[in-house]
Amino acid sequence: MRSSILFLLKLMKIMDVQQQQEAMSSEDRFQELVDSLKPRTAHQYKTYYTKYIQWCQLNQIIPTPEDNSVNSVPYKDLPISAELIHWFLLDTLITDDKPGEKREETEDLDEEEENSFKIATLKKIIGSLNFLSKLCKVHENPNANIDTKYLESVTKLHTHWIDSQKAITTNETNNTNTQVLCPPLLKVSLNLWNPETNHLSEKFFKTCSEKLRFLVDFQLRSYLNLSFEERSKIRFGSLKLGKRDRDAIIYHKVTHSAEKKDTPGHHQLLALLPQDCPFICPQTTLAAYLYLRFYGIPSVSKGDGFPNLNADENGSLLQDIPILRGKSLTTYPREETFSNYYTTVFRYCHLPYKRREYFNKCNLVYPTWDEDTFRTFFNEENHGNWLEQPEAFAFPDKIPFDFKKIMNFKSPYTSYSTNAKKDPFPPPKDLLVQIFPEIDEYKRHDYEGLSQNSRDFLDLMEVLRERFLSNLPWIYKFFPNHDIFQDPIFGNSDFQSYFNDKTIHSKGSPILSFDILPGFNKIYKNKTNFYSLLIERPSQLTFASSHNPDTHPTQKQESEGPLQMSQLDTTQLNELLKQQSFEYVQFQTLSNFQILLSVFNKIFEKLEMKKSSRGYILHQLNLFKITLDERIKKSKIDDADKFIRDNQPIKKEENIVNEDGPNTSRRTKRPKQIRLLSIADSSDESSTEDSNVFKKDGESIEDGAYGENEDENDSEMQEQLKSMINELINSKISTFLRDQMDQFELKINALLDKILEEKVTRIIEQKLGSHTGKFSTLKRPQLYMTEEHNVGFDMEVPKKLRTSGKYAETVKDNDDHQAMSTTASPSPEQDQEAKSYTDEQEFMLDKSIDSIEGIILEWFTPNAKYANQCVHSMNKSGNKSWRANCEALYKERKSIVEFYIYLVNHESLDRYKAVDICEKLRDQNEGSFSRLAKFLRKWRHDHQNSFDGLLVYLSN
């Protein structure tokens, strides 16, 4: 009872206060609000909101009063909202901050205190404008509505940026372990670009395409802060090119209200900006993934192909295709799949991982606009002045400038007009058109007939293509074995020259040529620290870092870059020149052989010969190219030293040359000679002579300069060394090419001899009929199937079987009398001989066969032991008596052969892959032929006498 009375008294008191406030005039309420502030705070607030009013007048948001009265405040008509306050902050505080003036006001403040001061000022201005909104409401201003959550997100954004930069500075000062400072974005991205990750689970990451698919999702999370559910809704048609900022890719996320599903409820616009570092650039990663997705990996997998924009009349096609491919073209990968990916990758990179940080909603996100605010704020009639100077507008492409910058790890405290660095080596147009060539095809033919979504998609792909090619030289420099470079177009001389021209200036410098991230440049622009982020280093990076002359450069060396290298002492300079010369020889040798092998490929493609022979030659050329690439890239100067030490005749010649020197005692006091050795595998006399000549020339140079001072001696040695290097490189390249060409000529001659021998043998067999047994030792047993195209099954295929012809139908018993299409069916004479011969020696199955390949060969290859009969021909003859002693074995092998024929004829698989799949299925059945046959018979019985679906079962 007592509590009820107290509640009624409080309620009556509140009602009395409300009645008193209603009875008060607007002037009294205004004065009451002003009196609630301390005098100093009231003065600060008035200063800030007076500046806001002047800014509104300057931008023509409100009219300027005719009397130019500063003290007159239009409380009743003044528009004030969270979006306008944000615009005001961007124009006057965030981007228009003058460091010179600030230093005068805060002379004793260091950088950290200045940042704190900026946040404190930001909060004070927001507080003053919130107070101004209350004053406007007193005057019944209908436009005084402030979204406090929006302004809280602005404060949170800048606090996050400054705190993160402060943490980097603090850790850098107090922590000697640079690994602690590494952001997950950098470490994960660099390691997922690396193709040589032997310890990363192949269950999830078999190819570079799967790594890039994960990396696109990871970088979308890092830059856009979207949950996995939100990322899964991004489609090709959702991404547009920025109209104001052509470097930005815009994602316009629209959500609809539950009541009106056709009417937009809220808008959220997000931006992806390019990065200087190629490995963390989301545009480069997306372009690389799409390249492998559209065109596939040669000899590994086929691509989906470029979208058919001619079929996208209403723009629905691009709205159905997700940015990442799941099991089908129109599905995004499942959340469970990517959850396993994230766990595996973070464990591999030794980074802490919390699932909610990458799959749930993030606290720091781009602002969301309701439909009315979005339409009103960006109305040209309301804010017309900024349209006259769009480059200075705080909301380019309707995205707040500071959100766009900070979300992309860039400082917002710059001017609006600050542009990204221009590429000193822009991609040549003749190379651009070779990447995603469909872009130019669509633009040349019926571009106007495409839907607007299709045209926007082509504009987007153009920007991605240019960014991709611009960063490709650096990717090639770090990871030349990446699957992207399996595409033959990147091996031609034009691309190789562009790659070399863009990266050659960085050779020898301990500093990277591109920026990393704000706050991390001081640490990770050093190549040694950057390489240390790799869990498994590629061979060429391991070699380069071990020969880096300066692993810990000073601050002066970091700023001066390659110029500092000229001041190194003689030993370091000699090592540097030696390494650069060796790398140059490697590059020239590799590029020249790639050109040579491409010419051979074209020649053999034009020659008239049997398809299987041409395929074999091209296959051998490709194997030779791969082997050559690996050997040249993995070769080191030390390998040449070891080769000469192990070669006794060359050692003796070197000793003779050393003993013939004019002054042995003087020579023993000199520093160790630099010897540039041949990279060729041969040990001919020319390499020894060149090495000896180089030694004699070096001795004569040093003898002539013995009496001069050290500086003159160094400069003369450098000039002489340069000339000798040029001469030596030319001689070594010609020697190496000559030797390799001789070896290649021998291989080609042997190959052609073998092909001619086989062809002659076949002609003789056709002429002589049954006498083929005499020449059977000249060739390998052949299966009679035509070579099918490689459809990219995800299994390693042992390239053993070589067959010709194609099966027409599956194998059946001789009762069915169904013939099979072969290229060399036995002649009637052979059938007669077979019948007479089987009376003498009965046909039998070989019980010692222990491989699928052996079973297939026995089934279709004529056997001289049984009058050139095979299982297939015996079935055609109608004689079943030979099966009496091996009926169970025959039925067992028949099931296996039927599955093999199904793979070749119905699934259109390459015969090598078909054999390999059978072997893998056999391994799953404990390696037993009988268990395999039983499994196959059961599958056919359960699936309407068909093997349909078995491949899908195996792949899962």
Swiss-Prot record:
InterPro entries: Integrase_recombinase_N (IPR010998), Ndc10_dom2_sf (IPR038279), NDC10_II (IPR031872), NDC10_N (IPR049055), TF_GCR1-like (IPR022210). Residues 544-564, 653-672, 679-715, 810-837 are annotated as: Disordered. Residues 549-559 have a biased composition (Basic and acidic residues). The keyword Glycosyltransferase does not apply. The modification Phosphoserine is found at residue 566. It is found in: Nucleus; Chromosome, Centromere; Cytoplasm, Cytoskeleton, Microtubule organizing center, Spindle pole body. The modification Phosphotyrosine is found at residue 706. It comes from the Eukaryota. GO terms for cellular component: CBF3 complex; condensed chromosome, centromeric region; cytoplasm; kinetochore; nucleus; spindle; spindle midzone; spindle pole body. Keywords: Centromere, Chromosome, Cytoplasm, Cytoskeleton, DNA-binding, Nucleus, Phosphoprotein. Residues 819-829 have a biased composition (Polar residues). One of its GO terms (biological process) is mitotic spindle elongation. One of its GO terms (molecular function) is DNA binding. Component of the CBF3 copmplex, which is formed of CBF3A/CBF2, CBF3B/CEP3, CBF3C/CTF13 and CBF3D. CBF2 strongly interacts with BIR1. Interacts with the central kinetochore protein CTF19. Present with 1350 molecules/cell in log phase SD medium. Acts as a component of the centromere DNA-binding protein complex CBF3, which is essential for chromosome segregation and movement of centromeres along microtubules. CBF3 is required for the recruitment of other kinetochore complexes to CEN DNA. It plays a role in the attachment of chromosomes to the spindle and binds selectively to a highly conserved DNA sequence called CDEIII, found in centromers and in several promoters. This is Centromere DNA-binding protein complex CBF3 subunit A. The lineage of its organism: Eukaryota, Fungi, Dikarya, Ascomycota, Saccharomycotina. The gene is CBF2.
